[in-house]
Amino acid sequence: MLGLIGKHLTIDMYGCIFKTLDDVDFVKETMLAAVKEGNMTLLNFTCHKFEPQGLTILALLAEGHMSVHTYPTMSYTAVDIFTIGEQSSPNQSIRVLKQSFKPEKIKTTNIKRGDVGSLSDMKPKIKLSTTPMRRVRDTSAKVFKFLSRSR
């Protein structure tokens, strides 16, 4: 039976700051900071800017890869981090990305790669988090909807 080969994290960031998502230099710097903070070794780096908006940036790492795809019109960013070994800290990379893109809501899915003998691998762990202001807005909308039905 094979043991765990690597960690694969997919991160969906909703409600990101619009202007940052189409700024090539900002996203590059953010991604390089995330690679460094996650104790990963950069081998190669490539970027493509789409017209009229959006970016795809890929980092080939000694430990795996990291990709960032931005969708400015949707205020959405999709991130993919795959690492092998125990020396890297992909969760630290996520912290850097969250601080830079400032999403209102984030969904992180953790997948254990190569853990063939584990049934728990069949169900990835999913973590949701929402900013406090988003919770206030959502609650306010629910209260308003409830009160408007009462009449």
Per-segment meaning from a language model:
Residues 1-67, 71-151:
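Polybasic/polar functional segments that serve as interface/processing modules
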